[in-house]
Amino acid sequence: MGKVKALQRLLTRSFSGKALAVRRVTENQGKNTPGVDKVTWNTPQKKINAVYSLRQRDYHPQPLRRIYIPKKNGKRRALGIPTMKDRSMQAIYLLALDPVAETTADPNSYGFRPQRSTADAIEQCFTALGNIYSAQWILEGDIKSCFDGISHEWLLAHIPMEKPYSGNV
């Protein structure tokens, strides 16, 4: 893991990594949605200033801006909106962690995975069922509120990431 951590450190500290993180945050669907600080990075100057402001040292995430969106059943779902800086820091961490996660992830898992789609999952179902020795059934599951029960301590202990940064994840 020494080489992995060295590459992660290089990526998270590099200008290019920071610029890519800012680009992802400022070119996505939520680019005009501010966090609690009411700041958006909507000009080239603000974007370049943002790249230079991203540092892990002394970084502390801000509180989330809480909004409620209506659900089909009439209830409302709470949504927490991070600041642009917090989103960019999360994007930097994702750049460092995603390659590790993708090499160890289940190859037959398709939800929330880069470069995978519903069509890919359906194709895999047909492939699996077409094998003479395959199972006869495919089970689909949805674990309600699964993220509420994930142990953050376990994640921090088992995901390879440089320790000074992992406390901010």
PLM ranges: what are they?
Residues 1-169:
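Non-catalytic terminal/accessory segments
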